C-alpha cells in the first residue's frame, strides 16, 4: 500500500522464521524474536551491531529452537565453528 507521497506504508509486515523460512502469522503467540549483540573480543563490551533471529512456534513446539539458534549463529560467525 502506498501513501500520497509514494512511500510504502503497511499496517502489518509479516516476519519470516530464520530457521525454516515460514511466515510467522499474527496469531502465532509462541513465536519469539531474539536479538544477539556482537561483543568486542578485546574489551568484552557490546558493539553497536546486533543480529536478530525470529523463530516460529512450530520450531519451538518441536523442541528444535536451541539447535536452530546454534546453527544460525555459527553461520553468521557469532559462535565459533567448533562450539
From Swiss-Prot:
One of its GO terms (molecular function) is structural constituent of ribosome. InterPro entries: Ribosomal_eS21, Ribosomal_eS21_CS, Ribosomal_eS21_sf. It comes from the Eukaryota. Its main location: cytoplasm. Pfam families: Ribosomal_S21e. GO terms for biological process: translation. It is found in: Cytoplasm, Cytosol; Cytoplasm; Rough endoplasmic reticulum. GO terms for cellular component: cytosol; ribonucleoprotein complex; ribosome; rough endoplasmic reticulum. Keywords: Cytoplasm, Endoplasmic reticulum, Ribonucleoprotein, Ribosomal protein. The keyword Protein biosynthesis does not apply. Belongs to the eukaryotic ribosomal protein eS21 family. PANTHER family: 40S RIBOSOMAL PROTEIN S21 (PTHR10442). This is Small ribosomal subunit protein eS21. It comes from Biphyllus lunatus. The gene is RpS21.
